[in-house]
Curated annotation (Swiss-Prot):
<comment type="similarity">
    <text>Belongs to the phosphatidylserine decarboxylase family. PSD-B subfamily. Prokaryotic type I sub-subfamily.</text>
</comment>
<feature type="active site" description="Charge relay system; for autoendoproteolytic cleavage activity">
    <location>
        <position position="251"/>
    </location>
</feature>
<keyword id="KW-1003">Cell membrane</keyword>
<keyword id="KW-0594">Phospholipid biosynthesis</keyword>
<dbReference type="InterPro" id="IPR003817">
    <property type="entry name" value="PS_Dcarbxylase"/>
</dbReference>
<comment type="pathway">
    <text>Phospholipid metabolism; phosphatidylethanolamine biosynthesis; phosphatidylethanolamine from CDP-diacylglycerol: step 2/2.</text>
</comment>
<feature type="site" description="Cleavage (non-hydrolytic); by autocatalysis">
    <location>
        <begin position="250"/>
        <end position="251"/>
    </location>
</feature>
<keyword id="KW-0456">Lyase</keyword>
<protein>
    <recommendedName>
        <fullName>Phosphatidylserine decarboxylase proenzyme</fullName>
        <ecNumber>4.1.1.65</ecNumber>
    </recommendedName>
</protein>
<feature type="active site" description="Charge relay system; for autoendoproteolytic cleavage activity">
    <location>
        <position position="91"/>
    </location>
</feature>
<keyword id="KW-0865">Zymogen</keyword>
<comment type="subunit">
    <text>Heterodimer of a large membrane-associated beta subunit and a small pyruvoyl-containing alpha subunit.</text>
</comment>
<keyword id="KW-0472">Membrane</keyword>
<comment type="function">
    <text>Catalyzes the formation of phosphatidylethanolamine (PtdEtn) from phosphatidylserine (PtdSer).</text>
</comment>
<dbReference type="Pfam" id="PF02666">
    <property type="entry name" value="PS_Dcarbxylase"/>
</dbReference>
<keyword id="KW-0444">Lipid biosynthesis</keyword>
<feature type="modified residue" description="Pyruvic acid (Ser); by autocatalysis">
    <location>
        <position position="251"/>
    </location>
</feature>
Amino acid sequence: MLDKLFVLSQYVTPQLAVSRLAGRLADSESTPALKNRVIKWFIGRYGVNMSEAAEPDFTAYPTFNAFFTRALKPGARTIDPAPETLTSPVDGAISQIGQISTDRVFQAKGQSFSLTELLGGDDERAEPFREGEFATIYLSPKDYHRIHMPMAGTLKEMVYVPGKLFSVNPVTAENVPNLFARNERVACLFDTEAGPMAMVLVGAMIVGSVETTWAGVVAPNSGKVTQWQYRGDDAVQFEKGQEMGRFRLGSTVVLVMPKGAVKWQPNQVAEKTVQLGEAFGKLNVK
């Protein structure tokens, strides 16, 4: 009953207004005393491990978002160096992992979503990934919220897709149809030695914004699907383990690979917690 009420509340809440307001407050430097109280409460409530942060003193962060997107101290995470290993791009918990069924990506029992819609509604963009592999990783409030490359790659396209801002958790995954292809998201497409790779950064309720290292905060005001091409001198090269983006509060990363490009590690299963840099799959490098 409580789950149903929670899901119903997601439909009636003014998601965009609430999330944008939360984002502005999280970026505010006007009330440092209040900011410090909120951060202290947040650390206690969610069990944030500040000992692994580059700046362990929570009062040193000028805003809540600066705290939320905090860097890790050197050596806090180890990136598996094996060239044939695809590594976890984030700290989080695996929501689902497996094979794409034509154009359908498994979401939860009785629920799936469209690969084509996830990537912005373009059939040509989605085609290389049909029957491919996917992993959906949820970042909880306590997690490190920067996103890193699971393998080396060259950015070729970024797509902003406007949408809803449902909360992203097991309850909504089981009860909100097409959740990850319904929420606001940023799809980043790369060329790699194993073929094309897509990393989709999915927004959620209270997520202030999604940010990439090459474009900053991605939030067009057009309300339309917006895409950017990166060719020639504009191409952006990334090394394995290099930061590529971050969430300013919350959410989920969907990693998509072509058929046969990767074999997931046997221990990487739904509900397992993962850390940035650990072995996630074995690549079939071309």
